[in-house]
Swiss-Prot record:
It comes from Geobacillus sp. (strain WCH70). This is Ribosomal RNA small subunit methyltransferase G. Belongs to the methyltransferase superfamily. RNA methyltransferase RsmG family. GO terms for molecular function: rRNA (guanine-N7-)-methyltransferase activity. One of its GO terms (cellular component) is cytosol. Gene3D superfamilies: Vaccinia Virus protein VP39 (3.40.50.150). Specifically methylates the N7 position of guanine in position 535 of 16S rRNA. Pfam families: GidB.
Amino acid sequence: MDTAQFHTMLEEKGISLSSQALAQFERYYELLMEWNEKMNLTAITDKPSVYLKHFFDSLSPAFYYDFSQSLSICDVGAGAGFPSVPLKICFPHLKLSIVDSLQKRITFLEHLAAELGLTDVAFYHDRAETFGRKKEFRESFDIVTARAVARMSVLSELCLPLVKVNGTFIAMKAASAQEELEQGKKAIDVLGGEISAIERFMLPIEQSERTIIFIQKVRNTPNKYPRKPGMPNKQPIQ
């Protein structure tokens, strides 16, 4: 996917990129490659693939959800900034918080935000399990995003405690999501969530399937969740 296709295919989905946004994506790619030489941020390095598999894919929730309103977003395990930084570039009014357990990734993201001129962005070096127990963050976000971080049963425990009641947890998955979802239904329910939509689409050009799961927070998460670091993965809610 070249930059012209990126621009055109987003236009077809109702997302118009300003010249500033296009320049920010260009700089994002440059910084990603520069920093990737000193730390492992992405295995995908050729420009067309980064634009398709990272930038375009990260914006896919906006094909189904209205990000034009004033929203607070928390991205759990953002890695090199996906999906939240592309969303912030396209929708600069979003109030963004990023949580990642690796300090060097946070350092990259802080540098990236400064270079791109992003405002109203906060970065937290923390485990999702401990972050979700802090009163100032627990059940405080309109949207929580996660992209292929863990299985749904695990991911729900890391993310749903951060979503405010009536807010939305957006889980971005590859094609194998159905089985994962079946195994994760109990956890979603226990943690106060309810599946509101499952959207499947083909990533253009390479025609690989993607699934986006939208989970609405319908009631408060019980105080015992999230459990201590490592427990959601070792003993998922079943």
